Amino acid sequence: MAFRTKQDQVAEILRERIIAGTYPRGTKLKQSQIAEELGVSITPVREALHTLEAEGYVAGVSHKGLLVPEVVPGAATEVFELRVLLERELTARAVAAMTPRDIVGLRESQARIVALTGSGTEQDMRAENYRFHFRLYELANRPQTLQFVRVLWAKYPFIGQEYVGRREKQLAEHERFLALLEAGDAEGAVQALVDHIESGWAGMQAGGPTEVEAASEPRPKRRVIRA
């Protein structure tokens, strides 16, 4: 496993929180609060936020500081099309390079998502879904493409939203992908992952988000950054 600096670790935790909706769109991110929650100094938090600003996960707003940005109207379709294009490529390369141990790792991530359906929050599930996808994409060993995909996830309108019936369907789609992977059907597995992305997009367009009560959402869990 590649060495990850404190800045890298903080950035990844913040990405997960934004994707999960722990920090809803419009939330102001305070460096001191994040540093205290993660048990680090201000410096890696500041550097991580600079990285996330470049990726589009946060945006600097005059007199307000760094906020989780709102969705750009009309951009969702283009973002979806780019996701399909790039994530298909990453998945194909990841599947070609995958070892049995990698498949076990994805299975473990899927098991955590399943466990969270009964005991976890929506934020927990969305964060674990993010880990599942990027655990897969990192196996492609295409860091520049991976970076573009991170940017696209930041711009996608699903951040912080849950769509009617999506939870069960997501689990079934992950399961289909894994089953094809374990059966040695590389082409089928890649198409299953693409179908999964397209299914999420179709559900978002057809069903719309269910109501999420921001006031009832738990505070971010304290995470400890390793030196």
Regions found by a protein language model. Give the residues of each.
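Mobile beta-alpha loop/short-helix "lid" or hinge segments that flank ligand
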Residues: 54-59, 154, 166-168
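C-terminal regulatory/effector modules of DNA-binding transcriptional regulators
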Residues: 165-227
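Short linear motifs at protein or domain termini
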Residues: 1-96, 101, 201, 205-227
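Short capping/connector residues at structural and topological boundaries
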Residues: 28, 161-164
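Acidic/polar helix N-cap motif
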Residues: 72, 121, 184-185
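Conserved amphipathic alpha-helical segments that form helical-bundle/coiled-coil interaction surfaces
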Residues: 79, 100-161, 172-179, 188-198
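Alpha-helix N-cap/N′ positions at the starts of helices
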Residues: 63, 86, 108, 169-172
